[in-house]
Amino acid sequence: MDPTSKSGLNQVSDVVFVIEGTANLGPYFESLRNNYILPTIEYFNGGPPAETDFGGDYGGTQYGLVVFNTVDCAPESYVQCHAPTSSAFEFVSWIDSIQFMGGGAESCSLIAEGLSVALQLFDDFKKMREQIGQTHKVCVLLCNSPPYLLPAVESVSYTGCTADSLVQIIRDRGIHFSVIAPRKLPALRSLFERASSVAGLPESSHPDYSQDPFHMVLVRGIALPVAPGGGSVPVSLKPVLPPQSLPVNQNPLVPVASTAPQMNTFQNVSLHAAHDAAQKALEEAANQQQKNRFGQISTPPFSQSPVLPPGGKPSLSTVTTVSPPVLTQQQVPPQQPQQQTQVPQPGLPAVNQQPPQASQQQPNNQQTPPPTQPGMAAVPAPPPGAQQGVANKVVAWSGVLEWQEKPKASSMDSNTKLTRSLPCQVQVSQGENLNTDQWPQKLIMQLIPQQLLTTLGPLFRNSRMVQFLFTNKDMESLKGLFRIMTSGFAGCVHFPHSAPCEVRVLMLLYSSRKRIFMGLIPNDQSGFVNGIRQVITNHKQVQQQRSMQPGQVQPNQNFLNRPPGPIPVTHGNVPQQLRAAATGNQQAPVTGAPPNQVQGQAQAPGGGMLRLQNPGANPQLRSLLLSQQPQGGMQGMQGMHPIQQMVHAAPGGGAQMQPQWRQPHQGPLMVPTGPRGPVTQNPGMPSVSSVMEDEILMDLI
């Protein structure tokens, strides 16, 4: 088997999925998606995709999607191709949007067309990666049909090539070719074998990744969860990760002393008992955590099969889901390499979910740094942000991060703010040059709702990333920071103008994918500052427009504070007016139009003018409404729409006014009633108008 590259966290990869978009694959796609596609994406992404993750266009994993059909799709194109993206979340949305149609009358599919376009994507990747050099390239074919014996015709560079010749080109270019199918097709297996290098291992040595006995899963360059009952032998076939981290990736329920020789020895027939014990533990873990594969961002799907191949993800995806009793067992033997198991304990997920265990284990983690991994020497102790085991990081800056948040105690004044601070470090990868000599000792952070930053995506991509690590000396502040950063806020760190440093602004985000606090330093500092100012200015203008729209009621607090009297009756405000009328004991007799005319006038605009909770069902309510108007109703109509003035005219003129507004405005009457935002606000959309957020936005401007 071709040696796999190091797993996705520290590797630059180019991944292209070639998927058959016909109805032949549609019934099986959900199973393939959950068992193979999502684990593959998480393998390269470092964890479950999250919408708030920001990745660089040139330094992270690039994903491409090619969807091919059959010859019966004419006159449509044979292939649909999506432009490369660095967002795993966006890539998953592309895959979920595939519509499997056609192909029911065909026994083959246009695999050659799909592979030819995939090769063109890899050519584009090569141009994008000129500054990086060699990357880990993977092409995954998902289909349920054998290929036509026809050459590709739609590709520009590979016209005339058949599927067999295309997989040979894929092999010659060092691209790892994988095949996933819901059934075992000899033609697809032949394609996979043609893409094998001469020095590859025999087919019997490939791990059995299939989660269903009917599935055919032949992969290279990817580490998937090993199928229950078939993963004991292939575990030792891909020793790619460093030996000191391999025991952590094995089943945590088995002593590491028995799994370490298993990883260092390719074929050791004397460890069948250890394999059996590992297999039983694997099945138990899979049964317990199968349902949590992709439902929660904080629970990576690899937790269902802790016995990963050595080419699998490092400890981020596996160890962070280990239960506290298992961690306690792993900490007993002192000779075991524990730097990986210590990482999730002081990390913020442990702070959020298991505070007792985290508080008990953190002192031990800080006082006994593992001497077994040389890469950890650069970090004095794993603070609670070093969830990944920062093996190749160096400290670029040390200081204090300060921010303000609203206190949780309801007894305190709502305008009072609680100032928190945490000692922190900024770390960069080895070889990177970040000049922090002029950075202040204290960084002041202001919180911004992430929904305001969605338009600044290009500026985020054109930025360099650093890692923030925090100590666990103040657990309350650490919990507060984690709670805020995971509830839709981002931190904007402003550097004072008095500091003569190149960086003027830095964004602090919590990456649920990598489980770290990462700082993004935009390369275009002035453009980023202007972008934030523009976003905040636009937000304030929208807020002002909402509060100043004519004919609409101000927020409920202002409305309740108004004295009773003649006020405009608009959307949904009848109960307040009724309350005001009742307190004033205004019981004027009803004269003029009959009640049925009033009811017709109120209902004719389609609920836009006068929206009663139950129109026509409360005659007392109608009489109170009508009794309000003669006492100076013209004063209340001055700020109303002309059509509203007609509707809310004195009751005596109701009969005359009714034909005037019904005939010319019966059709478009619902349009000029104005926006109904303040009344029909969706409670699910978080409003960015709280006291804390408004003050933050004012400070940023």
UniProtKB/Swiss-Prot annotation:
Q: Which residues lie within the region annotated Disordered?
A: 277-388, 580-617, 650-689
| Record field: compositional bias (Low complexity) | 314-367, 593-604
Residue ranges, compositional bias (Polar residues): 286-306, 679-689
The alphabetized UniProt keywords are: Activator, Nucleus, Transcription, Transcription regulation
SUPFAM superfamilies the UniProt entry points to: vWA-like
Q: What are the GO cellular component annotations?
A: mediator complex; transcription regulator complex
Q: Where in the cell is it found?
A: Nucleus
For this protein, the record's InterPro entries field holds:
Med25_PTOV, Med25_PTOV_sf, Mediator_Med25_VWA, VWF_A, vWFA_dom_sf
Which GO BP annotation is one of this protein's? roof of mouth development
Has keyword Transcription regulation? yes
Motif range (LXXLL motif):
621-625
How this chain assembles, per its entry, is: Component of the Mediator complex.
The protein's job, in short, is: Component of the Mediator complex, a coactivator involved in the regulated transcription of nearly all RNA polymerase II-dependent genes. Mediator functions as a bridge to convey information from gene-specific regulatory proteins to the basal RNA polymerase II transcription machinery. Mediator is recruited to promoters by direct interactions with regulatory proteins and serves as a scaffold for the assembly of a functional preinitiation complex with RNA polymerase II and the general transcription factors.
Which family, according to UniProt?
Answer: Belongs to the Mediator complex subunit 25 family.
* Annotated protein name in UniProt: Mediator of RNA polymerase II transcription subunit 25
Write down the species.
Danio rerio
